Amino acid sequence: MIEYPHIPVMLEESIQGLGVIPGGRYVDCTLGAGGHSEAILEHSYPGGQLLSIDADPSAITLAAERLKSFGSSVLLVNDNFANLKDICQRYEYMPVHGILFDLGLSSMQLDRQESGFSFQTEAPLDMRFSPEQELTAADIINGYDVTELSDLIWKYGEEPFSRRIARAIAEKRPFKTTTELAAAIERAVGGRHGRIHPATRTFQALRIAVNEELSHLESALSQAHSLLGHGGRLVVISYHSLEDRIVKQYFQKEAKGCICPDDIPQCVCDHQPSLRIINRRVITPSDEEISRNPRSRSAKMRVAERIIEPGEGRFFSSREDELVNHVSRTGSVQHGQAKHKGVVQRGGS
């Protein structure tokens, strides 16, 4: 039996949040090692379909082996989820019953030394999700001026010592490795302040900037929303406050009617609710899961459901609506096992 390097976070909660039904059509925007994808395929059997996306080609290779028994029920696409709508249109894969985002780094990305995501071991300052991207962490560290560096570390890392760190980097550069940079940051702030390493927030900021994570998330949420059929579910797992804030604010905006500024006496926006927030309070991992998988401790899950706007037609048949509504009421699905041959893989365009 093959052991996979990444443990899927809040797996049961993800399946319940998506309301997976037999014969449903789903998208996993963050394939990783394929743990969530595998569970979606099992629970949507018989007749379920899954499109799984990852910018990292090594994730596609690993997951293809894991999911090969599901055959043509799953389509693996090497692309960025910022291109979600184009991908679904390309493969005529719309509308869908549910879309999952499990944001942040997978364990295998953290543990892959050459990617430079971790400062625990010496590695080049890379931090790209895909080797096709041009900008690296080294480009930022060695090329940005002090003000640009300080602003970036504050904006994406919420680092209170951002100015001090930026000045120290400018004085000591060029930097080539993760350990060199982490040591310089630790010296700049005078050692640890709290339970996390002094370089943690700066490394987060660099990774977000290199991969344009926040702008891609904002774009992908809107695209995902438009791909959902009536009753379709959008599930997002985030790992830091910047991501969670974007998801929370998007869900709140789309779940209410008028979004005109408060100083306008009469509505002129004509905005209608198109999402229903399923969990008013954020869902977090259980103590048992955190003890089993410490990397899940910062995870937060939010779930929303697509509702029909006035004048909009239904995407799914009445039978599919019944299945979605049943899952919405009961929160349960039947577990099935699918056995097929030959996973379909596609590269990005």
From Swiss-Prot:
GO terms for molecular function: rRNA (cytosine-N4-)-methyltransferase activity. S-adenosyl-L-methionine binds at residues 34-36, 54, 81, 102, 109. One of its GO terms (cellular component) is cytoplasm. The keyword Hydrolase does not apply. Residues 328-349 are annotated as: Disordered. Its EC number is 2.1.1.199. It catalyses: cytidine(1402) in 16S rRNA + S-adenosyl-L-methionine = N(4)-methylcytidine(1402) in 16S rRNA + S-adenosyl-L-homocysteine + H(+). Keywords: Cytoplasm, Methyltransferase, rRNA processing, S-adenosyl-L-methionine, Transferase. One of its GO terms (biological process) is rRNA base methylation. Its main location: cytoplasm. It is found in: Cytoplasm. PANTHER family: 12S RRNA N4-METHYLCYTIDINE METHYLTRANSFERASE, S-ADENOSYL-METHYLTRANSFERASE MRAW. Specifically methylates the N4 position of cytidine in position 1402 (C1402) of 16S rRNA. Belongs to the methyltransferase superfamily. RsmH family. This is Ribosomal RNA small subunit methyltransferase H. It comes from Dehalococcoides mccartyi (strain ATCC BAA-2100 / JCM 16839 / KCTC 5957 / BAV1).
